[in-house]
């Protein structure tokens, strides 16, 4: 299978077929061959043009840069090892290779593993094992293990009377002491399902809400409480919940149990994924019109479409409490803005091109504003990132927009006059201290 193409491209990762049983138990069909063709004909992770020229859901899902957003903001320890269970077609594997010292990716489908091999062909720190994790014998333990869209299928791939718990127990044995498991999964009671979206895995509306009446399907998701209980009963002492928005598959914002969306947050069509494209006939409500009430009534955690759970015996969890990702931008502008527990804000470039161009230009813009006499948030460089202290103040943009909504044009003129006077040195620099003035790149990230 693709032996000639592999030989021609001579990828760097190790491709281990020792545990492969010569059958692929799942597939998206012929489109997977087309995806492999796109991967082979383009430089790694440069698929945007090809995706939009031949747009369909499987191609977009497997090759979209938004797939990386589930983990590209996460702080992995330096020199760490990671086991990726269910790497699929490599959507997240390259992120792990860039962030960790050693990566072992396991994939049950040889065709999908081949896609990962070619997609990560330049990664020398990667081994891909084709086979069922339950059959594989490992000779080492890992700092991190990822289960991104995998746990829900263990009713099919783990033979046990309690497959979900037994699978997690096995995984815990592969972690180093204080190692961390990262689990991404849909919420059984996600808001999209209440609106009539067919359940992601079985394709039937309200199937999860109705408690998965057909238990023979071998696939299911969990509520937050049920998932937390399952993880802890499997032996993990601590959990920390993140809420990828709009879901874990194509997230643009990562909320957490410490930083939940507030009334003023932009939970609307700006970052909204159109779930209705699958089958509009099943929808009974418009999801994006419900979020304001969900947030105001304090039940976002129950209705969040997806979870990302950090699991460990260590209590050192939740180092990052919020992240906003801009992977949908052009490559040179892709950034992760993340809030840390120690009240700093880090802007991390997600591509080398962004690090080399946009970050440098950002600092130039900051200096220009300073030289012009405009008081702005202080930024510093740290390991390739742009770092600042978190300041709990409104953005000037928001203050002006609120005045506009209220019809208070006098307030708008007053603020503009203050900026002009500060620019000309005609008023004290602390006159605008109650407002944050940010560069254009910053203003949307820290709302």
PLM regions with names:
Residues 1-41:
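N-terminal auxiliary segments of SAM/dcSAM-dependent transferases
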Residues 89-100:
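Conserved SAM-binding loop of SAM-dependent methyltransferases across substrates and taxa
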Residues 99-127, 132:
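Class I SAM-dependent methyltransferase SAM/SAH-binding core
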Residues 137-145:
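A short acidic, Gly/Pro-enriched loop at the edge of an enzyme's catalytic core
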Residues 162-180:
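A short glycine-rich, Lys/Arg-flanked "PGG" loop and its adjoining helix->strand segment in the class I
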Residues 316-397, 407-432:
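Conserved ATP-binding subdomain of kinase catalytic cores across diverse folds
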